[in-house]
């Protein structure tokens, strides 16, 4: 599954949307634009990450259960601190940040469906783990985009969930009998290979909303698929957050926990963020050399996804060679997808031979 995403993503998937939605705020960051592709020569000529970092050059993630209010709080934090907001990565994250930005057919987007998961989480066609595997790869791409933006411009980023909290859904799926143990083993192997390559958030904000209130919000929202989510599944997500995620993250970054009504006061949350010491975690040990290595990784999206390709047979995410080749060839026939970004005349790219 990740191999399919690897083949369908250009090397610089974040280039198209790098500065989208970013704000220019005085004394907050050097620039919201990354004009040239970073490399060894740029580093030698003085493009050093440490020169761009300041007190607001942070990675902040907002976590919580379904319908816990993550989006609004994350947007408010980003706006008040002059950071860039990254909405939660979904199935179409890769297509939204590459090509013309339009959603692609399900065949090019993991062959999975969130609606189908809600309707029939125990479907025997493997949709549940295919969905989880694809979403992890999407979060990985987004996290690499966020780090690329921060290291290239100095502007802080605020994300809704991340690769560090994604596992809470896997644990809930397994506890509810939606996926097999082999799927859990495969997922954990991918985590083992990918997480060490990245730096964790500087701060995690968790919105603690009781399952009963979550269910009430879901019913009020009125999504016919989401309304089928059980309280047991939501409780397993909450348990994974509180028993595993928060204790682990508290060892390597700052953690703030708010109730649903406390999270509504974003000004108070921002004040708490500004009072944090940020005196633990691997960010303290970084220098221009380690930042250079990380920048080289996160700007190469094929390399980012390469870490997720584990050579193991798993029916839920395995497709045949002929089917894979057909999908790849069909993808390359789409507008703006045949060559690297900026080299496709069919979508209006100019001066191709001079690039």
UniProtKB/Swiss-Prot annotation:
UniProt modified residues of type N6-acetyllysine: 122
Q: Which domain of life is it from?
A: Eukaryota
CDD domains from the UniProt entry: NDUO42
| Name of protein | NADH dehydrogenase [ubiquinone] 1 alpha subcomplex subunit 10, mitochondrial
| PTM characteristics | Phosphorylation at Ser-250 by PINK1 is required for the binding and/or reduction of the complex I substrate ubiquinone.
Please give the InterPro entries that the UniProt record associates with this protein. Answer: Deoxyribonucleoside_kinase, DNK_dom, NDUFA10, P-loop_NTPase
Q: Which GO terms describe its cellular component?
A: cytoplasm; mitochondrial inner membrane; mitochondrial matrix; respiratory chain complex I
- Write down the PANTHER family for this protein, in alphabetical order: DEOXYNUCLEOSIDE KINASE (PTHR10513), NADH DEHYDROGENASE [UBIQUINONE] 1 ALPHA SUBCOMPLEX SUBUNIT 10, MITOCHONDRIAL (PTHR10513:SF15)
Offer one example of a GO biological process linked to this entry.
mitochondrial electron transport, NADH to ubiquinone
> What are the alphabetically sorted keywords of the record?
Acetylation, Electron transport, FAD, Flavoprotein, Mitochondrion, Phosphoprotein, Respiratory chain, Transit peptide, Transport
């Amino acid at each position: 599954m990740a191999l399919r995403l690897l083949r369908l993503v250009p090397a610089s998937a974040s280039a198209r949307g790098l500065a989208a939605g970013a704000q220019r705020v005085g004394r907050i960051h050097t620039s919201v634009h990354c004009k040239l592709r970073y490399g060894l020569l740029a580093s030698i000529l003085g493009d050093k990450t440490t020169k761009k970092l300041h007190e607001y050059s942070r990675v902040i993630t907002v976590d919580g259960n379904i319908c816990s209010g993550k989006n609004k709080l994350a947007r408010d934090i980003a706006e008040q601190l002059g950071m860039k907001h990254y909405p939660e990565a979904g199935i179409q994250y890769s297509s939204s940040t590459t090509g013309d930005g339009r959603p692609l057919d399900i065949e090019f987007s993991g062959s999975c469906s969130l609606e189908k998961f809600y309707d029939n989480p125990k479907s025997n066609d493997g949709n549940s783990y295919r969905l989880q595997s694809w979403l992890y790869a999407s979060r990985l791409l987004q996290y690499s985009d966020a780090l690329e933006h921060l290291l290239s411009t100095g502007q802080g980023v605020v994300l809704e969930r991340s690769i560090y909290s994604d596992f809470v859904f896997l644990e809930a799926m397994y506890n509810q009998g939606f996926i097999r143990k082999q799927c859990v083993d495969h997922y954990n192997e991918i985590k083992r290979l990918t997480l060490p390559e990245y730096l964790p958030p500087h701060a995690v904000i968790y919105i603690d909303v009781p399952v009963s209130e979550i269910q009430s919000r879901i019913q009020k929202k009125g999504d016919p698929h989401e309304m089928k989510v059980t309280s047991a599944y939501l409780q397993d997500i909450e348990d994974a957050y509180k028993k595993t995620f928060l204790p682990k993250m508290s060892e390597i970054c700052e953690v703030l926990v708010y109730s649903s009504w406390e999270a509504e006061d974003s000004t108070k949350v921002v004040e708490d963020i500004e009072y944090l010491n940020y005196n633990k975690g691997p960010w303290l040990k970084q220098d221009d050399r380690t930042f250079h290595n990380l920048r080289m990784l996160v700007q190469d999206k094929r390399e980012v996804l390469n870490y997720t390709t584990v050579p193991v047979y798993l029916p839920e995410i395995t497709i045949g060679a002929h089917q894979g080749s057909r999908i790849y060839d069909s993808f390359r026939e789409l507008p703006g997808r045949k060559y690297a970004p900026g080299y496709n005349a069919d979508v209006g790219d100019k001066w191709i031979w001079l690039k």
